[in-house]
A protein has these predicted regions:
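ADP-ribose/NAD+-binding catalytic cleft of ART/PARP-like enzymes
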Residues: 1-23, 38-41
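Conserved NAD+-utilizing ADP-ribose enzyme module
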Residues: 22, 41-190
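Surface-exposed, glycine/proline- and aromatic-rich loop segments on solvent-exposed faces
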Residues: 24-28
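Short, conserved phosphate/pyrophosphate- and ester-handling motifs at nucleotide-, phospho-/glycolipid
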Residues: 31
């Protein structure tokens, strides 16, 4: 089975959309729990909540990696997971087959395709945060809370956020998000 997250209801066929890879693709995971993190985009959510207007595609934000075969969410700022996912509802779509599917090399258990994917089933997720905590409790994914991060990781976050901010000169939504969530790091960067 393959899984895809979306805020949209009643999708019968997953259609390729312009992606981070610069071409229309459908992204799916072989693990339902891995799809949960795509129910919310922290940048989009923060901009909407703060009234920052925007038209066009949203910058993606993903603070996860993989550890011992499991997705691991890292909180890059205090309460980031609650902040990003609490109160966000959406749908997890299931597909039995992925026409033209290829393994996505940089994300374990992920599959991409440039072809439409027929939907087999749909699950409503009323609160993405609660679903993520349930998956953590079941041992299906890992969470490293901000207070648990090692000093080396905090230093990496500091450096990475400064670099991301500098490179996002033409992406005002992303800069707005970074300023709002990392004010101490961004202070004085202009």
């Amino acid at each position: 089975m393959f899984y895809h997250a979306s805020p949209a209801h009643c999708i019968e066929v997953l259609k390729p959309q312009v992606s981070n890879h610069g071409r229309p693709l459908v992204y799916l995971s072989k693990k339902r729990e891995n799809a949960l993190v795509y129910l919310s985009n922290a940048v989009e959510k923060y901009c909407r909540e703060t009234g920052f207007s925007h038209a066009g595609p949203w910058q993606k934000w993903a603070s996860y990696g993989f550890y011992e075969g499991k997705l691991r969410l890292d909180e890059y700022y205090p309460n980031a997971i609650w902040d990003t996912y609490k109160g966000v509802s959406g749908y997890i779509y299931a597909a039995e087959e992925v026409p033209g599917g290829e393994e996505q090399e940089d994300i374990p258990d992920a599959v991409i395709t440039s072809q439409p994917v027929p939907v087999l089933g749909c699950e409503y997720v009323p609160d993405a945060y609660e679903a993520i905590l349930e998956a953590e409790e079941a041992g299906l994914l890992l969470i490293r809370r901000y207070g648990e991060l090692p000093e080396a990781m905090l230093a990496w976050i500091d450096s990475s956020i400064k670099q991301e901010y500098a490179e996002a000169e033409d992406i005002p939504t992303y800069r707005h998000f970074l300023k709002g969530k990392f004010p101490e790091i961004i202070a004085g960067l202009g």
